[in-house]
Amino acid sequence: MNPNLLEKDLRGKETTNGSIRYKEANNFRSLPNSHTAACKTSLNNPSISRNHPHNKSASVLESEDEHGNERGENEKSLRMRGKSGINTKVCSRGHWRPTEDAKLKELVAQFGPQNWNLISNHLLGRSGKSCRLRWFNQLDPRINKRAFTEEEEFRLLAAHRAYGNKWALISRLFPGRTDNAVKNHWHVIMARRTRESQRQRQQPPPTLSRDAEMTVSSSCRYNQGKFINEEDDDDDVSAVSTCTTELSLTPPSSAYQPRFFNYDSTLASGKDGQCVQRAEVNGIYGKKMDHQNHHTISVSERKVEMKMRSGYYYFDFLGVGAS
């Protein structure tokens, strides 16, 4: 082969008789118009070209991004873990168990009540702050756990009026009491007072009810110049008259004014020669009760009425009758 015919261009491609021998240029010149349009749209829309099934570079970039995210998450998780490989950020927020309290007492006795981060490393699931609060509020042997006395409650209310909600400052006035205990007991006192005030509001006033009714009745018989109780002599039929006193107290429906009692007795004819003595009551309701007025009273009954009103009774020893 003639060495003059073989030449190299600036790109390192071999040429024969001045013609370029790489097919890419010829193929690019012979591309149809549809393919060139698709290339232009792919350049304008990078998302379409990236998601094209024949685009291998896009898939490679996506796999690199996924590996990068996983690597970042692993580094973050390792950063959150301590030297022992335990995730110290995950702490239980439930109630303290007796085993945890016993373990905390042992650790405080070993390291002292100040190295709380070191103590929390030996107590799984608890932070340093949680251990400190548990110790100073519940487990410290210097805490006074007895009930508050009346004198302490009085001083607590006075201190709250003076200092407000500064519980740490108020707790210094109560040796052995924590700020949390002082605050909780103040709320207990306020709740107790609220219940007592509500109970007093619900109680009815101490007045007589309008539906109350009191009836007092007494009966006696007047026989031959003396009064005899009906329970003592039920078989005696020679009674001249029988007097029955009824006191009734019923509330009226209208407004009232307080008055004194006024006793007004009348004798009304009853059955079988009985006379009924009724009393009108002007009570706290200030209105006279309805009563029965009987105008047909016999002569003997009128004499008994006159004797009763005059204050003495007529005794017929000779049996001649009243004159």
Curated annotation (Swiss-Prot):
Residues 1-84, 192-217 are annotated as: Disordered. GO terms for molecular function: DNA-binding transcription factor activity; protein homodimerization activity; RNA polymerase II cis-regulatory region sequence-specific DNA binding; transcription cis-regulatory region binding. Residues 27-60 have a biased composition (Polar residues). Residues 116-138, 167-190 bind DNA. Keywords: Brassinosteroid signaling pathway, Cytoplasm, DNA-binding, Nucleus, Repeat, Transcription, Transcription regulation. Induction: Levels follow a circadian cycle with a progressive decrease during the day time (at protein level). Down-regulated by brassinosteroids (BRs) in a dose- and time-dependent manner. Repressed by BES1. Auto-activation of expression. Targeted to 26S proteasomal degradation by the CULLIN3 (CUL3)-based E3 ligases CRL3(BPMs). Mostly expressed in flowers (at protein level) and siliques, and, to a lower extent, in roots, stems and leaves. Expressed in embryos (e.g. heart and torpedo stages) and cotyledons, and, at low levels, in roots and inflorescence. Accumulates specifically in root apical meristem quiescent center (QC) and vascular initial cells. GO terms for cellular component: cytosol; nucleus. Disruption phenotype: Smaller seeds and embryos associated with smaller contracted endothelial cells and reduced cell number in the outer integument layer of the seed coat during the seed development. Increased quiescent center (QC) cell divisions. Early flowering under long-day (LD) associated with FT accumulation. It comes from the Eukaryota. Signal peptide: none annotated. Residues 1-14, 66-78 have a biased composition (Basic and acidic residues). Forms homodimer. Interacts with the dephosphorylated active form of BES1 in the nucleus of quiescent center (QC) cells. Interacts with BPM1, BPM2, BPM3, BPM4, BPM5 and BPM6 at the promoter of FLOWERING LOCUS T (FT). Acts as a cell-specific local repressor of quiescent center (QC) self-renewal by cell divisions in the primary root. Counteracts brassinosteroid (BR)-mediated cell division in the QC cells. Regulates maternally seed size, especially before the heart stage, promoting both endothelial cells expansion and cell number in the outer integument layer of the seed coat. Modulates the expression of genes involved in cell wall metabolism such as cell division and expansion. Negative regulator of flowering via the repression of FT transcription. This is Transcription factor MYB56. The gene is MYB56.
